Structure formats: C-alpha cells, structure tokens
C-alpha cells in the first residue's frame, strides 16, 4: 500500500491542512493518508493545546474523509524525536508499505538544517506541497526551481526529483505537488479564536471543530 505520512501540530486543524493532504493523495494516487499529530516541537516556546484536544479536533475534521486515517503513533512516544528517526521506525514497522513523507515548501527549504535532513530520502520518499507564495515557478520547472534552492539542497533535488507523479520506489523519490491556496494559517486562526470570532473562523474550519472549541473553551485569552 502507498501511504502518505502527514505530520504537524494541527493546533488547530483547518481546511488548508485537509486540502493539502487530499491534493497529495490524489496527485500521487496514494491509498491512504495518515495524519500524525506530533508532540509540540522543542523549538516552539508557545504552550499549545493538549494532545487530547488536538486529537479530538482532528477526528472531527476527518471523520467524513475517505482514505484518511489519524495515528497517535508519535503522541504515544515519551520523548521528542527527529523526523529521520521517526521515518526509519515507521518503515521498519510497515515493510509492506511504500511511505511518502509530506512536507511544506517552507520546511523543505530548511531541510539541510534538520537532523540528518539530507539523508531523509534514503529512508523514505518526500512530497513537497508547493505554495504559490513561496515559489514563483511551476511545480516541475526544474531549472528555475533549482536556482531558488539553498546550495546544500541542490544536489539532492537534481538526483531525486521525479519527472512524473507516479510512485515507483520505496525510497529516494521527490515530488513537487501543487498545493491549493490557503488564505489563513493556524497562527492566524488562533488569533481569531482567542477573540471569539467564530463566524469568521468557520470560513476556514469544520463547524464541528468550531463547536468543540467553543464547548471546551479552547484558545481563550
């Protein structure tokens, strides 16, 4: 089975997250997307919503989506771990599956600064959700895209970029996927929710999630 691994804090989950996940699933013909809420990264100094609340909101937001599964794999870990180590572990646990790690353009452009980031393709495939505001070029305009990459990423990009949206290997393939435009971020949504501007937030979030937030008084000032 071909499976996309989509990690994040999802604090809160919004339509941009879901549209992005489904865009990758459709573009690569994946059998399943596994949304994996993670522990709050060590570099985030903000006190986030509880794991239980983030998980509950994800379940509400995805309950009607076919081929989308929520995994608590990372939340169940007792310590924070690096993406490279996580993908090694997941690959060992799922030898029958071909995994694709899904990431945004902003994260990909910093991949060389991650722990063993330049080695990530040796243990998995990568799908980069190309955001129009980040890159001015078309998804597969290789020459122009290459010029915008940090130097450490250029050899990786040259070697791994797939010329089509067809998964053909267990590791080593890099895909650039056009990402539906999203007009809001989780940070901006938290600002709306803190001000109890729920009607505006409903433009970007599942109403069931909004109801959960109101009922549990999340993101209150």
Segment roles from a protein language model:
Residues 1-221:
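Nucleotidyltransferase catalytic core that binds NTPs
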